[in-house]
Design a protein with these regions (language model features):
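Short, Lys/Arg-rich flexible segments
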Residues: 1-185
């Protein structure tokens, strides 16, 4: 292949990498996959908090691999796929132990009065709500299913295709010094 064409392809892939890395990162800020909003959380553990962002590990894990003529975006976190695609998780004994641990952790953080009653301040009320959530989860039957809604942050969409098409058109126009338009079928 002509070296100029190889350089142009490399430049196109580099431009796509930069643009799509930014766009996929912005999905976490938008709390949507481009224009497709993510389902709100039901869990009271972080009310009003960002969806899919707790420590930011999932957001930072999005990477890409580039070859001579392709680019692939991916994440290697084990829980990324269930969030991106949605699905159901079977409750296990180990999960129930974890839920009980979180319940006791939340109840142990209650602010208490001298007589031992929980305070009625905002933080204690928030923790009581959180504790109830963890108790509800811990009391689920082993083998029952927890539904995880689909919250895509990576993938192909009309917005991705449009951005890629524009990048290709810009680079070809620059290379040939001629207006170029890729029509979608």
């Amino acid at each position: 292949m002509n070296k100029d064409v190889q350089k142009m392809i490399a430049r196109i892939l580099q431009d796509i990498r930069v643009e799509m890395t930014d766009e996929f990162d912005r999905n976490f800020e938008r709390q949507a996959f481009f224009s497709e909003a993510w389902q709100r959380r039901k869990s009271p553990t972080r009310p009003g908090g960002s969806i899919l962002i707790d420590t930011g590990r999932l957001r930072r894990s999005v990477s890409c691999r580039t070859t001579e003529n392709s680019i692939t975006f991916y994440t290697d976190l084990p829980y990324a796929a269930i969030h991106n695609d949605g699905g159901e998780i079977k409750v296990t004994k180990k999960m129930k132990r974890y839920f009980w641990h979180k319940y006791y952790e939340a109840t142990g953080s209650f602010g208490r009065r001298k007589n031992g009653e929980p305070r009625k301040d905002k933080r204690t009320v928030q923790l009581a709500t959180e504790a109830e959530f963890w108790k509800f989860m811990a009391l689920k039957k082993e083998g029952s299913m927890i539904k995880i809604p689909r919250r895509r942050f990576l993938g192909v969409s009309p917005e991705v295709e449009k951005a890629v098409r524009e990048i290709i058109e810009e680079n070809i126009t620059e290379y040939f010094n001629v207006e170029f338009d890729i029509r979608r079928k």
